[in-house]
């Protein structure tokens, strides 16, 4: 790593309320010039890292780059998901509407530590990717709510119409494997009247009344602007996110939907 790039990674620009943006210090640099372990270490602390001015990698190069840091999560389509709006979407991820909060890997055999997006084409209005710092949400929650959360287990059910689906059961609270911090593991329910491939939730471990209270509270608390960073995409952006502490989703598109993201997940 050159000294100038090292300084750029260490300094960067702080995002609000969390995250860091790093701009390439010289022309001609690509993602491959950023050591993956340095990048993930930065992402572990900042939770979200935005790289601008770095050239994107082809799919094979991107997979090799990320594999240097660990195993890559594989799906039926391979390791890299092309996120584009489709004319007849079988899943809400490919629709022009919003994507409620969730975490990656709820229906997978292993939960990824990080995921990385490349923005191949970023033109359009709306569609910001929104990240919620669940660690901070937990820290600032009232004690009586924390006690309910600690007893709650949620079963998620969705038809496998895309690359994931079935049944998954998770405690509402988790422990971050690297930092030991308490995290919130929650995927918001998806109303079948609004979303392709809806998601249904059952809350166990607490009373039905408390289950309703928990879900209604999370609907408001997780979307509090104090805990959320909304990324407005530009063509060429690279975003690395820490999957254990964050929940993420997407705002609905309000105009053109000619956007193309590529996503890969590192276990």
Language-model features: where?
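Glycine-rich loop at the start of a catalytic domain that most often binds anionic cofactors/ligands
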Residues: 59-70
